[in-house]
């Protein structure tokens, strides 16, 4: 089957310059956005910088929380061939400093995926819905009217300049997107408070071993030698492991390849292991964008900070963000206007679904840049981690008195850190409550943002961390 047949591109489409919608990036968010728009009968093209053979090959930890549900535009059944390990059901947190391992239950459905296979399946799903793909196409600039409305992009394909005009542009180009560098977004609510230091630098290898690992039912985490970083070992199968590590870019740079190699060499289960694939990436371990809309323009997935800032997980959030953005884009096209007011509902749905929770979790990412890693690991090893994890996953802000007393008894010697964590959780809860009152229109945005910034000052004061934003 040819590439054009595989993605439904007719020869005439390669020279076409006018579309209802242009989506930049064939990742999870971009493909779900395009599939949703195409399902509604609109002409949509996905511009992808990679070749047809490389598209979908993305650096990822491969772990997926929330594997039980995906938006209808690309159903879970189409993605399931990429789910290589659905037997994972808990986290395993290794603390070498304390010679301790915490087995932490994780509610909900987990899976580890083959990310390249998953990427191809998502692309197939968007193509099946009617989206057109233009591969080997790199965006160079964003087209805007005098009033700032985005009307398309300029790109280059194999040395040939291309113009794409559209009613709506969806930015699914990933972390530190070039579209946001090129577009003038100053006169809208679109979040431009974005710097590299809010991101995590990560690297992963796909490693094969001869004997099954003992922890094939777990997602394994291990702290790096400095704060604000961790190693992971996520089993695709009993003998195929996604091994990687990352660190927050506020910290002194790590030698990612060498540090991972050192840890692999010190683990008996990886003796004689063979490396199949290597990739690195920047991950937006930050709060979601305050607003990801601008007239004629919406950002989705990594391009809008739709990632859990404590784990780096972003597949499920990207799928829903792409869907929500597309549904709002469809409404805007039906109304004949792509103003911020019409697109705003997309922001609300993101915050309601996962954005508020991610913003609160970002408080703990901020704390990790200021806390002494050995002190924190000592506390975690002393605390009844399994029970505390279960209580926190349940969504309860209050632990039972029995658990509180047990925790305090086991945390002797770490009371300063316990108090810091307690106060930090109060700040996170306050922030969560504020995000749950996200404004229903741009009119209330400035007031909401000012109060959020005030709450963040309290976060920095409590944690002792340098300002992240």
Over which residues does each language-model region extend?
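Beta1/beta-strand and adjacent pyrophosphate-binding region of the FAD-binding site
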Residues: 10-29, 45
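Glycine-rich FAD pyrophosphate-binding loop
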Residues: 22-26, 35-58
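FAD/FMN-dependent oxidoreductases across multiple families
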Residues: 101, 141, 253-326, 333-334, ...
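Short beta-strand to alpha-helix junction loop
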Residues: 105-124, 248-256
């Amino acid at each position: 089957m040819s590439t054009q047949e595989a993605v439904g591109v007719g020869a005439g489409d390669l020279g076409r310059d006018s579309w209802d919608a242009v989506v930049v990036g064939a990742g999870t968010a971009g493909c779900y956005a395009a599939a949703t728009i195409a399902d509604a009968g609109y002409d949509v093209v996905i511009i992808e910088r990679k070749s047809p053979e490389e598209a979908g090959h993305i650096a990822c930890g491969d772990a997926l929380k929330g594997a039980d549900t995906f938006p209808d535009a690309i159903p879970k059944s189409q993605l399931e061939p990429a789910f290589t390990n659905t037997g994972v059901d808990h986290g395993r947190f290794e603390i070498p400093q304390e010679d301790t391992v915490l087995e932490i239950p994780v509610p909900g459905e987990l899976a580890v995926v083959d990310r390249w296979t998953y990427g191809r399946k998502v692309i197939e799903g968007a193509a099946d819905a009617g989206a057109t793909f233009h591969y080997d196409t790199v965006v160079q600039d964003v087209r805007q009217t005098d009033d700032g409305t985005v009307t398309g992009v300029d790109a280059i394909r194999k040395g040939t300049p291309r113009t794409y005009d559209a009613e709506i542009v969806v930015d699914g180009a990933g972390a530190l997107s070039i579209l946001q560098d090129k577009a003038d977004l100053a006169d809208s609510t679109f979040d431009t408070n974005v710097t590299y230091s809010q991101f995590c630098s990560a690297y992963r290898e796909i490693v094969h071993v001869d004997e099954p690992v003992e922890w094939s039912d777990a997602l394994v985490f291990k702290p790096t030698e400095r704060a604000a970083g961790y190693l992971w070992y996520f089993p695709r199968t009993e003998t195929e492991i996604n091994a990687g590590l990352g660190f927050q870019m506020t910290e002194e740079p790590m030698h990612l390849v060498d540090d991972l190699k050192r840890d692999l060499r010190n683990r008996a289960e990886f003796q004689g292991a063979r490396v199949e694939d290597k990739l690195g990436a920047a991950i937006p371990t930050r709060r979601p964008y305050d607003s990801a809309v601008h007239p004629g323009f919406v950002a989705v997935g990594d391009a809008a900070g739709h990632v859990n800032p404590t784990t780096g997980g972003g597949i499920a959030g990207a799928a829903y963000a792409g869907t929500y953005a597309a549904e709002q884009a469809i409404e805007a096209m039906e109304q004949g206007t792509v103003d911020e007011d019409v697109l705003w509902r997309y922001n609300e749905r993101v915050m309601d679904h996962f954005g508020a929770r991610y913003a609160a979790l970002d408080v703990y990412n901020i704390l990790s840049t200021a806390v002494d890693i050995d002190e924190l690991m000592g506390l975690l090893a002393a605390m009844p981690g399994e029970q505390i994890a279960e209580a926190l996953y349940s969504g309860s802000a209050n632990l039972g008195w029995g658990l509180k007393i047990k925790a305090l008894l086991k945390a002797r010697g770490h009371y300063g850190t316990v108090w810091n964590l307690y106060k930090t959780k109060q700040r996170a809860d306050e922030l969560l409550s504020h995000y749950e009152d996200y404004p229903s229109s741009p009119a209330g945005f400035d007031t909401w943002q000012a109060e959020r910034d005030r709450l963040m000052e309290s976060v920095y004061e409590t944690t002792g961390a340098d300002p992240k934003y």
